[in-house]
Amino acid sequence: MARYTGPATRVSRRLRVDLVGGDMAFERRPYPPGQAGRNRIKESEYLLQLQEKQKAKYTYGVLERQFRRYYVEANRQPGKTGDNLVVLLETRLDNVVYRAGLARTRRQARQLVSHGHFTVNGKKTNVPSYRVSQYDIIDIRERSRKMEWFEEAQDRLGEAVVPAWLQVVPESLRILVHQLPERAQIDVPLQEQLIVELYSK
């Protein structure tokens, strides 16, 4: 299955949640597309679980096979499977770049990582799904620092609310991973227990 590259607002409306952040088009019409969009259909338990999974997949830009692998790994780890799942998604490299304010959207962050603009602990890393660890140091590659995009990112650095588990060094745009996040620190509108129930069937 190919990755969805169409209008994010359409998906946000279908799932009734802003997947982009600050999506004015969604705020104007926060109901599913189509003439009957305003009339909510009766939602079964399965549909609610499926919608929650779709919400997580579209939020983090993950396809079904990879998402299932995340679930399997989360289920193996100690603690709550749902919490573990969200932490695994949140610690993807592309998401960390987005959370640090170096990209306006996760989709944009994924592109920047894929194009090889970052190093992790001094090594070039172009895999968006790379999982960061505590004490990792993420830098913009030397040849990429003069790009107009990163210069603009530096100018607007104060606009982003960087989560407490990360730190951005303003002069170099270096990202420091002080710790792995806890579920309470992750502000995504997910009911992950519904996803756990879906995969547990």
From Swiss-Prot:
Residue span, S4 RNA-binding domain: 91-154
Pfam families in alphabetical order: Ribosomal_S4, S4
Keywords, alphabetical: Ribonucleoprotein, Ribosomal protein, RNA-binding, rRNA-binding
InterPro entries tied to this protein: Ribosomal_uS4, Ribosomal_uS4_bac-type, Ribosomal_uS4_CS, Ribosomal_uS4_N, S4_RNA-bd, S4_RNA-bd_sf
Alphabetical GO biological process terms: ribosomal small subunit biogenesis; translation
Domain of life, per lineage: Bacteria
Entry GO MF terms: rRNA binding; structural constituent of ribosome
Transmembrane segments: none
Recorded GO CC terms: small ribosomal subunit
Record text on subunit structure and interactions: Part of the 30S ribosomal subunit. Contacts protein S5. The interaction surface between S4 and S5 is involved in control of translational fidelity.
Stated role: One of the primary rRNA binding proteins, it binds directly to 16S rRNA where it nucleates assembly of the body of the 30S subunit.
Family: Belongs to the universal ribosomal protein uS4 family.
The name this protein goes by in its record: Small ribosomal subunit protein uS4
Record organism: Corynebacterium ammoniagenes (Brevibacterium ammoniagenes)
Upper lineage: Bacteria, Bacillati, Actinomycetota, Actinomycetes, Mycobacteriales
